[in-house]
Structures are given as C-alpha cells and as structure tokens.
C-alpha cells in the first residue's frame, strides 16, 4: 500500500490509497461515519482496475489525521480479537 495525502486542512483530509480496493475503504468509511467527530466520510474509486481510491474525511474540527489513526487502531484491535476467538474455536 502506498498512501498519498492530497489535501489536508484543520477539519478535512483527502487521501489516495494506491493499490487498495473496496474492502479496506468500505471498512474505514463504515467506522469513520460511526465516530461522532466525523461529519462526512466517503471514498471515490472511478474504476477498480485503473484508478486508486481516494478517501475523504470531514470532522467537527478534530484533526482528521488523528481520527484516521484512531480508526486504524480500532481495525487492528478487531482483527486481533478475531484471531483470538478463531484460534480458540479452531482448537476446541
């Protein structure tokens, strides 16, 4: 994955995520819009095989980079929990 910040203000962020697909972007968007500090979160991908997705975040004034980092940490925690639960189930 290669990440390129296209635009950043105090409450908005536009990030290109090269090589990523709907899988990661949908997960990020879904978690971002559940955050009370986020006023808008969506992504645009013109065509999955010829363009890279661009993620847009608008916050209530909270640093959007901080919000995105915290969202990534939530995803990591959820994956860790899944590994734990799956390992226990697989060994039962």
Curated annotation (Swiss-Prot):
Q: What molecular functions are annotated in GO for this chain?
A: DNA binding; DNA-directed RNA polymerase activity; protein dimerization activity
Q: Name one GO cellular component term.
A: DNA-directed RNA polymerase complex
Picking any one GO biological process from the record gives:
DNA-templated transcription
Where is it localised? Cytoplasm
Major subcellular location class: cytoplasm
Report keywords, A-Z: Cytoplasm, DNA-directed RNA polymerase, Nucleotidyltransferase, Transcription, Transferase
Q: InterPro entries from the xrefs?
A: RBP11-like (IPR036603), RBP11-like_dimer (IPR009025), RNA_pol_Rpb11_13-16kDa_CS (IPR008193), Rpo11-like (IPR022905)
Kindly report, in one word, the top-level EC class recorded for this enzyme: transferase
Q: How does it assemble?
A: Part of the RNA polymerase complex.
Family membership noted in the UniProt record: Belongs to the archaeal Rpo11/eukaryotic RPB11/RPC19 RNA polymerase subunit family.
Q: What role does this protein play?
A: DNA-dependent RNA polymerase (RNAP) catalyzes the transcription of DNA into RNA using the four ribonucleoside triphosphates as substrates.
- What name does this protein carry? DNA-directed RNA polymerase subunit Rpo11
Q: Which organism is it from?
A: Methanosarcina acetivorans (strain ATCC 35395 / DSM 2834 / JCM 12185 / C2A)
The UniProt gene name for this protein comes to rpo11
């Amino acid at each position: 994955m290669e990440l390129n910040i296209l635009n950043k203000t105090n409450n908005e962020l536009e990030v290109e995520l090269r090589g990523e697909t709907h899988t990661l972007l949908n997960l990020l968007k879904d978690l971002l819009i559940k955050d009370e500090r986020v006023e808008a979160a969506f992504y645009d991908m013109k065509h999955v095989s010829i363009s890279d997705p661009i993620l847009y975040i608008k916050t209530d004034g909270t640093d959007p980079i901080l919000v995105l980092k915290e969202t990534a940490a939530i995803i990591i925690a959820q994956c860790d929990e899944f590994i734990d639960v799956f390992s226990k189930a697989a060994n039962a």
